[in-house]
UniProtKB/Swiss-Prot annotation:
Residues 1-233, 267-328, 472-516, 661-742, 762-790 are annotated as: Disordered. This is Protein HOS4. InterPro entries: Ankyrin_rpt, Ankyrin_rpt-contain_sf. Identified in the Set3C complex with HOS2, HST1, SNT1, SIF2, CPR1 and SET3. It comes from the Eukaryota. It comes from Saccharomyces cerevisiae (strain ATCC 204508 / S288c). PANTHER family: ANKYRIN REPEAT DOMAIN-CONTAINING PROTEIN 39-RELATED (PTHR24171). Residues 67-85, 135-149, 277-293, 481-496 have a biased composition (Polar residues).
């Protein structure tokens, strides 16, 4: 078929159905392949014998090769024809046998072998036999053909490789056919034109119109193509990837197994395992390092045609609404539909409502994040039109915005639209990267179109960043530390900020955040010399892992330019300081572009790093391969971050550099004037000396300094024509002097190897010349030779020079070692301070916990007291009215509750009611179990409660009598007075208080066991005791029960003779009542 033919979209089938069909087909075809194994082994053995025979014949009998080829070719053809015939006969035999068994046995076929086994076998064998016989075996005319080589002969004798069943399935596309469709026609169609099957398959309408979108649904067929490098997943989707179930051998286009593998990369994960914006490290945390991680950002006002206000969302995980479907990652169906590119479904969901368009999943990603990540521009436009926040950030662990996701994945149209609708290109994620820095390097892509897209994205982000910062007024608002609050996405990192960050790092929230970060690299001794160690150093320099870098260089590890530039680029001042302290040259440039560290540091908002480099002696006048200086990159930042203070700092550094070297040049000029004769003599001597001495002179530091001065002054003309006025006289004099010597230095530097060879030859010639041959020479030549001999270095001079060089090296090593010791001492002091601060924090934490524990104990005690009070109040509500109003603090009003009632048992022991004694003595402990033995207590019989109520009503209903002179036995006055209350109300109160009285716990106790310390009080109480009879209570109760058992009035009325008069018919009832009342006491 034509390769340009486009494939039609395929029908989407369920994953479980597809897998079951594939596994069934695999089992069937494996059984078929086993039947052919023996035949293949026999054939392979024959082929090996043929190859061996052919090699031996070719080696021993080269003259009979032609005849041997014809014989072997005919034998091979005959063997092949016999094999094909045998296979055809076997196949026909098996078909006849199977059809015969089907007629005889009916449905006796096993369940695990489908009916299409024979058809599949027939088709496969036909395909194999046709493929094995036709293409690779040719009928060759041996007589008319040219002689064969040994390789051609071996290729002719070797039988073509037979295809296995798995290869056949993979090539012919049988894995995509349903089991019920596996007929002869379909199988034959698949073996000839496998592409035709795909044309008849389309996506079902249910996938397009339904709102029930799942995480396993396929992505829309019109999704944008990702840039062809590699596919990574976002941090929250790391665990979502799944592997193929069949080792990637049988996955067809209907399978959704690898759907999760096509998730686009996220800048957070692609840029490293940890943020260059560091929290407090475990070891070396107090050094000044990268900008803080969690800046406080305010909304920046801007003017836009859409009149939409800028907003940067807080990276807190929102409260998720209940009742809305979410997958394992916390995504709603709206987010899933945006991820899959289903525009119609998204539009329908938004129109129907019920979904928060800015709802975030477990990783803090919104629907706009999903659409921007996958590059669905139509969905992005729809979401923004309906109020999606373009600057919302994911959780603090990632901190990505939709613009960062779109930029990292190369979606140019999405980037354009987001920038047009107010997306902030200066926002940094948790890795400290902006959208510009998240874009991949062009060198990682081979396609020119992809490179063009990346360049366009960077261009637009750079322009947008400049416009954004200019609108924010960055040139007018400077911070104390030099970092502009509007330009840089972090606050100034001074000592105060550092202390706050350290304090925040010790808090539980920051501690939990640190735990979520990837662990730092561990140092091994092999890292010093291995390539893996250099990669670890590069990663640590990029991510700001100070402990690893310190340990690496302390153990003698070599610092490379790549790691140094990365630490400068990311703004890690502490790591840059360590590199410089251990002797890394601050002015070393890259090999390709001649870029210096200062050029890398400027224009990125790392003002502290720029200051550090300048203090370490960075040359601000260096130029790269394009002739640009650090000042140019500071003014024309590729990230759009221009800081006026940084520009001023570099200009001052250049001015100071020029001024310093101009003074040095003036001093050199004075020395030249004072030693003019010596200088002239040196000039004359240069014309006659040997090339070696000339090369030595050209390599002196003086010439190098003069070349640097020349280059520096040229830079001054380019960068400061309009800004600074340099002294004309000093500049012109030094420039003239340098131009005179520049050509000499250049000439010797270009021809160094040639001059060295010529010089050696000249010395050998001088040595080979005899004294006789020297005599005819002119006095001028002898004088030149004499001068050259005079200036040759003697042994003493050489020893002195070597000694000076050795002393200089020692001093330099000592100075370097001293610097390293000072740095390590500083690191140790910082570590000690950090440990002290941690101990202090621990003490404060212990005090806080102790205070919190005490406060909690007090709170629990108060709650317990309130609970006890509430309990007592609840119990008090169960007391009768008279008991409530008794004052238990007054122990002298016992007379109000007399007389005291008691009864006598068989042993003549007096028993009193404990409740009345408690009221008399105001002793609550009297009712406790420990005070009175349980064996000596007699519980109150329920039948006695009514008589006791009648006796003690004056206490529990009326609250006792008044203790005054007017109160007497005949006319008692009580606390509670029901004189003004009608009879029904009074009866109701009495009934209510009686119910409370009978619920009180009461018991009879021995009067002798009651302890009263005041004998007068005891004597007075005993004088007011009244004896009652318990037996009478029992008899009265029994009579009452008997009365209840007596026939009712109606029953008795039926027994009364009707002949009696009416006034005598009820005589018996009246007499029983009279008898009962006569037995009861009248009190």
């Amino acid at each position: 078929m034509n390769e340009t033919t486009t494939k039609q979209p395929l029908k989407k089938r369920s994953l479980s159905s597809y897998l079951s069909n594939v596994s069934t087909r695999r089992e069937e075809l494996e059984k078929i392949s086993k039947q052919e194994t023996s035949e293949e082994e026999d054939t392979a053995g024959k082929h090996e014998q043929r190859e061996t025979l052919s090699e031996e014949v070719s080696d021993k009998f080269p003259e009979n090769v032609a005849s041997f080829r014809s014989q072997t070719t005919s034998v091979h053809q005959a063997t092949q024809n016999n094999l094909n015939a045998k296979e055809s006969e076997d196949l026909a035999h098996k078909n006849d046998a199977s059809s015969h068994e089907g007629e005889v046995n009916g449905d006796s076929r096993p369940d695990d072998v489908p009916e299409t086994n024979e058809k599949i076998s027939q088709a496969i064998r036909a395909k194999i036999s046709s493929s094995s016989s036709s293409p690779n075996v040719r009928n060759v005319d041996i007589q008319n053909h040219q002689p064969f080589s040994r390789d051609q002969l071996r290729a002719m004798l070797k039988e073509p490789k037979r295809k296995t069943v798995d290869d056949f399935i993979e090539e012919e596309g049988l894995g995509a056919v349903e089991e019920e469709d596996l007929s002869d026609e379909v199988l034959e169609k698949n073996t000839t034109e496998p592409e035709n099957v795909e044309k008849d398959i389309e996506y079902s309408d249910s996938d397009k119109d339904t709102d029930d979108v799942g995480s396993d649904d396929p992505t829309a067929p019109n999704s944008p193509i990702k840039l062809g490098r590699r596919k990574l997943v976002r941090g929250d989707q790391l665990d979502a990837t799944t592997s193929s179930m069949f080792n990637n051998e049988s996955d067809s286009e209907l399978s959704d197994i690898d759907d999760s593998k096509n998730i686009a990369l996220s800048s957070s994960l692609f840029r490293g395992g940890s943020s260059p914006v560091k929290e407090t490290n475990n070891n070396l945390s107090n050094m000044n390092s990268s900008p803080a991680q969690n800046p406080k950002r305010g909304s920046v006002s801007r003017s836009n045609d859409s009149n939409k206000s800028s907003h940067i969302a807080v990276s807190k995980r929102p409260k998720q609404k209940k009742g809305i479907y979410r997958d394992s990652g916390g995504r709603t169906r709206l987010q899933i539909a945006c991820d899959k590119g289903k525009y119609d479904v998204v539009k329908k969901m938004i129109e129907e409502g019920g979904y928060d368009i800015n709802d975030q999943d477990n990783a803090g990603n919104t629907a706009l994040h999903e659409a921007a990540l996958q590059g669905h521009i139509e969905i992005v436009e729809l979401l923004i039109e309906n109020g999606a926040d373009v600057n919302i950030k994911s959780i603090e662990m990632f901190g990505d915005t939709p613009l960062i996701d779109a930029s990292a994945n190369g979606h140019l149209d999405v980037v354009k639209y987001l920038l047009k609708n107010g997306a902030d290109p200066t926002i940094r994620n948790a890795k400290g990267l902006t959208a510009f820095e998240s874009v991949d390097d062009e060198s990682e892509f081979d396609d020119e179109e992809d490179q063009k897209i990346l360049r366009e994205i960077k261009k637009r982000l750079s322009i947008a960043a400049k416009k954004w910062t200019n609108r924010a007024g960055i040139h007018n608002d400077k911070s104390k530390n030099g970092n502009n609050a509007h330009t840089i996405d972090q606050p100034p990192f001074d000592n105060t900020t550092k202390a706050k960050n350290e304090k925040a790092a010790d808090s539980p929230s920051m501690a939990s955040n640190i735990d979520e970060k990837a662990p730092e690299e561990e140092f091994y001794w092999t890292d010093v010399t291995s390539r893996a160690g250099k990669e670890k150093l590069f990663k640590a320099s990029k991510e700001g892992h100070l402990p690893y870098v310190g340990t690496y260089v302390e153990n003698g590890g070599k610092i490379d330019l790549r790691s140094f530039f990365e630490s400068v680029k990311c703004g890690h001042e502490d790591i840059t300081s360590i590199f410089l302290a251990f002797g890394f040259p601050v002015n070393q440039t890259s090999r390709d572009n001649k870029t210096s560290a200062l050029m890398v540091a400027v224009g990125r908002g790392h003002l502290g790093t720029v200051k550090l480099l300048l203090e370490a002696g960075a040359d601000p006048t260096k130029r790269d391969k394009k002739g640009r200086t650090a000042l140019y990159y500071a003014k024309n930042s590729i990230m759009g971050i221009t800081n006026s203070e940084e520009i001023q700092l570099i200009e001052n550094a250049i001015n100071n550099y020029l001024k310093k070297h101009s003074e040095d040049n003036n001093d050199d000029d004075d020395d030249d004037d004072n030693n003019n004769e010596t200088y002239k003599h040196e000039k004359k001597r240069e014309k006659t000396q040997s090339p070696i001495l000339a090369s030595r002179r050209s390599a002196t530091p003086r010439i190098e300094d003069e070349e640097d001065d020349t280059r520096m002054l040229n830079l001054a003309d380019d960068d400061f024509n309009n800004d600074r006025d340099v002294k004309e006289s000093t500049t012109s004099d030094s420039r003239k002097r340098l131009d005179d010597n520049e050509n000499v230095g250049t000439q010797y530097s270009l021809d160094w190897k040639k001059r060295k060879t010529n010089a050696l030859q000249d010395e050998e010639k001088l040595k080979s010349i005899s004294p006789l041959s020297m005599e005819p020479h002119s006095p001028k030549k002898a004088k030149s030779v004499e001068i050259s001999k005079i200036h040759e270095e003697t042994a003493a001079e050489r020893e002195a020079r070597l000694k000076e060089e050795e002393e200089y090296r020692k001093k330099r090593l000592e100075k370097k070692r001293k610097k390293e010791q000072e740095l390590l001492q500083k690191l140790a002091e910082d570590e000690k301070k950090r440990i002290e601060e941690q101990e202090k924090q621990k003490v404060l934490e212990m005090e806080r916990l102790e205070k919190a524990t005490l406060e909690k104990a007090r709170k629990m005690e108060r709650e317990k007291e309130m609970e006890e009070i509430s309990y007592r109040r609840a119990v008090r509500d169960l007391y009768p009215l008279g008991l409530k109003i008794i004052n238990f603090n007054d122990k002298l009003d016992y007379k109000r509750f007399l007389p005291l009632y008691y009864f006598v048992d068989e042993k003549n022991d007096k028993f009193v009611l404990d409740l009345q004694v408690m009221i008399l003595l105001k002793d609550i402990d009297l009712l406790s179990k420990d005070n009175q033995p349980t064996s000596e207590k007699i519980p109150v019989d329920p039948s006695h409660l009514t008589p006791l109520w009648n006796m003690l009503k004056f206490i529990f209903l009326y609250g006792g009598s008044y203790d005054d002179k007017k109160n007497n036995m005949e006319n008692k006055r009580y606390v509670v007075n029901f004189d003004g209350v009608d009879l029904d109300t009074k009866i109701g109160y009495e009934l209510l208080e009686y119910k409370k009285f009978v619920s009180l716990p009461m018991a009879w106790i021995k009067w002798d066991n009651v302890v009263i310390e005041n004998h007068a009080k005891r004597k007075e109480i005993e004088g007011n005791m009244i004896q009652i009879s318990i037996n009478e209570f029992a008899r009265w109760r029994n009579d009452k029960l008997n009365k209840a058992q007596q026939p009712t009035r109606k029953q008795r009325s039926l027994k009364i003779p009707r002949e009696l008069p009416v006034k005598f018919q009820h005589r018996m009832s009246i007499s029983s009542v009279l008898q009962q009342t006569s037995k009861e006491p009248f009190w």
